[in-house]
């Protein structure tokens, strides 16, 4: 869905155009931006700049604060891990937002993810499942982050452990994630995450520098 912002001169701009000018601080545009946040949750899209603009408008206009939109922005930022979007969003929260019980729950979930305690995360996610039920693709976005961590941590991993880290998924879904990440079943309940040939190898790099490139610099040193 295309969101257009109505300007005072009667013209319309896209949200991206509006965010590039002083109009991003106009509270008259907040409702349009909040609707855009809701569309991101529904359609599995993501716009960090627009979401941060909403939080900034809440800072300037605390009487317009919408907690449901705040929750959605924070949860959407979690889907962007390992990027630091959540930290940036958290830094824009007002004291009354920080004191909110649901905000604290989301912050706790973020802390659990950042320390890679994925088993605990899925347990807490199940308890709080209604919080992000409206966010399309939330679970798979977290599984993508889990896969990133697994890929940088393991060379081989037990299949049952991998299944647990990905949220206790079905065997068929597990096979789909193994294939998606380019991993391979080794047999005996093991999954190869990184092949021996994929290990980082040192490489000597020789760069040819012409005398003309450094001649002027050498002359200054004489």
Curated annotation (Swiss-Prot):
Pfam families: CSN8_PSD8_EIF3K. SUPFAM superfamilies: ARM repeat (SSF48371), Winged helix' DNA-binding domain (SSF46785). GO terms for cellular component: cytoplasm; eukaryotic 43S preinitiation complex; eukaryotic 48S preinitiation complex; eukaryotic translation initiation factor 3 complex. Keywords: Cytoplasm, Initiation factor, Protein biosynthesis. It is found in: Cytoplasm. GO terms for biological process: formation of cytoplasmic translation initiation complex; regulation of translational initiation; translational initiation. Its main location: cytoplasm. Residues 46-208 form the PCI domain. Signal peptide: none annotated. GO terms for molecular function: ribosome binding; RNA binding; translation initiation factor activity. It comes from the Eukaryota. Component of the eukaryotic translation initiation factor 3 (eIF-3) complex. The eIF-3 complex interacts with pix. Belongs to the eIF-3 subunit K family. Component of the eukaryotic translation initiation factor 3 (eIF-3) complex, which is involved in protein synthesis of a specialized repertoire of mRNAs and, together with other initiation factors, stimulates binding of mRNA and methionyl-tRNAi to the 40S ribosome. The eIF-3 complex specifically targets and initiates translation of a subset of mRNAs involved in cell proliferation. HAMAP family: eIF3k. This is Eukaryotic translation initiation factor 3 subunit K. It comes from Drosophila melanogaster.
